[in-house]
A protein has these predicted regions:
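An acidic-aromatic substrate-binding cleft motif
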Residues: 1-27, 31-36
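Substrate-binding/catalytic cleft of secreted carbohydrate-active enzymes
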Residues: 27-180
Length: 180
């Protein structure tokens, strides 16, 4: 999820999610569960944008101080969001695997509290996904023809969903004027 989505509040999500739809995006990744606003999920439902929703783990091989509190929060998140049609994937960890016992718990939580009909993926960039990077803008054709700079080697049919990249972010107009 790009920085400009993280700065939204309330009705601003409607326009920004609509722009994603108009750009033919079909999924937004809620990186590490950064956005919690109901308006975000409502806008995604409205415009038919799927959400890849991460839990709050970030490629760090440490457990939260209280794994039981973490799990209770995960259950509450699932219950709160499960009725949104936009939720497509629940993801356990950004660029890593949730350490025991969390991975097992999160997978069970998704099955029990979300009816078991949505995907749970433990790691955001492995197990069949296209992987990390590149962390730069690329020629638009590359997103459908080749993986630049060795990222996603052996991809012959384009990238599909790249979990580690997003829409390009442009600075504010005021900052751009100062730069020029």
């Amino acid at each position: 999820m790009s920085e400009y989505m993280l700065r939204c509040r309330g009705e601003e999500y409607d326009l920004k999610v609509k722009l994603h739809q108009e750009m033919n995006f079909n999924m937004i990744r809620n990186w590490i569960g950064s956005v919690t606003d109901d308006e975000f999920y409502q806008a995604c439902d409205k415009y038919g944008i799927m959400v890849w929703d991460d839990f709050w783990l970030n490629s760090n091989s440490n457990l939260p101080d209280d794994v039981f509190a973490f799990n209770m929060n995960a259950v509450e998140k699932i219950k709160r969001l499960r009725n949104h049609a936009c939720i497509a994937v629940w993801c356990g960890d950004n660029e890593g695997y949730p350490l025991p016992p969390l991975n097992k718990w999160l997978e069970e939580d998704v099955n029990v509290y979300d009816g078991g009909d949505r995907a749970y993926h433990a790691n955001s960039h492995s197990d069949g996904l296209s992987g990390s990077g590149p962390w730069m803008n690329s020629h638009p054709n590359w997103y459908f023809t080749k993986a630049p700079y060795g990222y996603g080697a052996n991809i012959t049919r384009g990238w599909g969903l790249r979990t580690e990249i997003g829409t390009a972010v442009f600075t504010t107009f005021e900052s751009f004027k100062k730069f020029i």
